[in-house]
Amino acid sequence: MKIARVTVTPIAFKDGPLLNASGIHEPYALRSIIEIETDNGYIGLGESYGDAPALKILDLVKEQLIGLDPFNLNGLRAIVRGVVAAMAPASNAGAELAPGSHASKAVSNAYSAFEVACLDAQARYLNVPLVDLLGGAVRKEIPFSAYLFFKYAQHIDSPYAPDGWGEALSEEQIVAQARKMIEENGFKSIKLKAGALDLSLMHI
């Protein structure tokens, strides 16, 4: 079984004006969908960052994957390392457009995107759940957790409309956000992305 085709599709979806230690989220989150197809018709999917520097690496890697056995993950890693090493000066000079996509993580980010797609293809070929290739399931279900952010009411620049969740810059507004998540979605676990504001006396 060999990889016959690789497609990298950039996507963008709306993101709220969420605050973090490095600033504010962009109006759109950029991701990429990776699809590999083998010469015997199996398909594997993965996903990763979708900013320009990340896409450049993904596009360069995909060209070298044709003919690779999707079970050959060491070969995949060697290809990714070679691509990143060849373009290291350009990667270091580029701006980080998506959190986590800077040059120091370029190998692991690109490798993991294609690794998941290869593992998916392996599982489909073997007709087993992917989790079985990773040692087996520990449990059948995992509950979702809510994620609270300090946030503005809307993105700073026009023409972006106000965010449906409203402003959350105070203790009361964060609590209201948590209650809304619980009431509308039934969350039982809630995490807070702190560190965006200097609220040393804040108690939640």
Model-derived regions: residue spans:
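Structured beta-strand/loop patches that form or line metal/cofactor-binding pockets in enzymes
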Residues: 1-45, 49, 56
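Structural preference for beta-strand elements that scaffold enzyme active sites
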Residues: 33, 141-145, 187-191
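Metal- or metallocofactor-binding catalytic centers and their adjacent structured scaffolds
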Residues: 37-126
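Short catalytic-loop micro-motif centered on adjacent basic/acidic residues
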Residues: 45, 190-193
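Glycine-rich, aromatic-flanked loop segments that form ligand/cofactor-binding clefts
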Residues: 115-157
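Active-site mouth loops of central-metabolism enzymes
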Residues: 143-175, 194-196
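Alpha/beta enzyme core
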Residues: 172-188
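Conserved small/polar residues in nucleotide/adenosyl-binding loops
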Residues: 202-204
